[in-house]
UniProtKB/Swiss-Prot annotation:
SUPFAM superfamilies: C-type lectin-like. It comes from Gloydius blomhoffii. Expressed by the venom gland. The lineage of its organism: Eukaryota, Metazoa, Chordata, Craniata, Vertebrata. This is Snaclec mamushigin subunit beta. GO terms for biological process: blood coagulation. Belongs to the snaclec family. PANTHER family: MANNOSE, PHOSPHOLIPASE, LECTIN RECEPTOR RELATED.
Length: 146
């Protein structure tokens, strides 16, 4: 009986010490502020990258940023693996929903845009965002909530 109590107490201590420390993320993912992140050194188009992320884990998508601290965390993950490179992030203008108008205030009625939509990539060195054709291939950072 004493062994059982000791073992039960030991398991309780391990469980309590692991809760809230990223234990809810799979071992190959990194935890930050209730989310799990993973860098994939696989170059693919933006659309394929988003699809790839959704196939990795339920509710996983290309990374989104909601604070400068989160940006710093992701840069600290991507830099050692990818060095000077770009990664796709979860921003795009695929549906071209921006309202564009001329400097004289008239709306755009003739469209001569290249049909390629623009997606957003982030530099791994400082996370500056750049608009890139969605057909370009870059590495991937996926994110999901723990």
């Amino acid at each position: 009986m004493g062994r059982f109590i000791f073992l039960s107490f030991g398991l309780l201590v391990v469980f309590v010490s692991l809760s809230g420390t990223g234990a809810d993320c799979p071992s190959d993912w990194s935890s930050y502020e209730g989310h799990c992140y993973r860098v994939f050194q696989k170059e693919m188009t933006w659309e394929d990258a988003e699809k790839f992320c959704t196939q990795q884990r339920k509710e996983s998508h290309l990374v989104s940023f909601h604070s400068s601290e989160e940006v710093d965390f992701v840069v600290s993950m991507t830099w050692p693996i990818l060095k000077y490179d770009f990664v796709w992030i979860g921003l795009n203008n695929i549906w071209n929903e921006c309202m564009v108008e001329w400097t004289d205030g008239t709306r755009l009625s003739h469209n001569a845009w290249i049909t390629e939509s623009e997606c957003i990539a982030a530099k791994t060195t400082d996370n500056q965002w750049l608009s890139r054709p969605c057909s370009r291939t870059y590495n991937v950072v996926c994110k999901f909530q723990e």
